[in-house]
């Protein structure tokens, strides 16, 4: 094992939340990341501020990332899910302090309209957004998050009607 791999594995995971946001047609909000040239689509996610509960963090992050908090939590994941970022990204993310994220996931029903969504927030994360079907979600997600997304889909699938 190389020194950089060992250092990578010694780093902790950043605590965070992820949101599977459903519209009235049970399609899922996905955004294309603004900070990469590759087509990197993902569901909204973000960090937990010290002292904040995961559910409060999820609603705050929803507002920060899609410009709306019109919605309500249907379910919270039973587990913390984690993913590692590719080692070349570690120095570029979170000041190199984390190997990836461990996240609590939330299934959220969006009660607003498309016009309520504004990704041009004060710190934009996405340059495009759209609603994706459950079937297409896993095919458009950035590969290093795919295993985590498969687990989240498996947990929430029965609640998406």
Curated annotation (Swiss-Prot):
Keyword check for Hydrolase: yes
GO biological process per UniProt: mRNA catabolic process
Span of the annotated motif Nudix box: 46-67
EC number(s) stated in the UniProt entry for this protein: 3.6.1.-
Family label: Belongs to the Nudix hydrolase family. RppH subfamily.
PANTHER family: M7GPPPN-MRNA HYDROLASE (PTHR23114:SF17)
NCBIfam families, per the entry: PRK00714.1-3, PRK00714.1-5
The protein's name in its UniProt record: RNA pyrophosphohydrolase
Record Pfam families: NUDIX
Key words of the record: Hydrolase
GO MF annotation terms: mRNA 5'-diphosphatase activity
Function of the protein: Accelerates the degradation of transcripts by removing pyrophosphate from the 5'-end of triphosphorylated RNA, leading to a more labile monophosphorylated state that can stimulate subsequent ribonuclease cleavage.
PROSITE patterns (alphabetical): NUDIX, NUDIX_BOX
GO cellular component: cytoplasm
Recorded coiled-coil stretches: none
Keyword Cell membrane: no
Residue ranges occupied by any Nudix hydrolase domain in the UniProt entry: 12-154
Source organism of this protein record: Rickettsia conorii (strain ATCC VR-613 / Malish 7)
Cofactor(s) needed by this chain: a divalent metal cation
InterPro entries: NUDIX_hydrolase-like_dom_sf, NUDIX_hydrolase_CS, NUDIX_hydrolase_dom, RppH
Matches recorded under SUPFAM superfamilies: Nudix
């Amino acid at each position: 094992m190389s020194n950089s791999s060992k250092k990578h594995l010694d780093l902790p995971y950043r605590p965070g939340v992820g949101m599977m946001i459903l519209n009235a047609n049970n399609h899922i909000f996905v955004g294309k990341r603004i900070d990469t040239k590759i087509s990197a689509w993902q569901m909204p996610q973000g960090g937990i501020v010290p002292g904040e509960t995961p559910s409060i963090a999820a609603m705050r992050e929803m507002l920060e990332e899609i410009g709306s908090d019109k919605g309500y939590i249907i379910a919270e994941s039973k587990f913390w899910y984690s993913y590692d970022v590719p080692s070349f990204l570690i120095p570029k993310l979170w000041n190199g302090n984390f190997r990836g994220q461990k996240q609590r996931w939330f299934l959220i029903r969006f009660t607003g309209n498309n016009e309520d969504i504004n990704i041009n927030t004060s710190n934009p994360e996405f340059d495009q957004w759209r609603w994706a079907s459950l079937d297409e979600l896993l095919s458009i997600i950035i590969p290093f998050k795919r295993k985590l997304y498969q687990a989240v889909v498996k947990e929430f699938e029965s609640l998406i009607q």
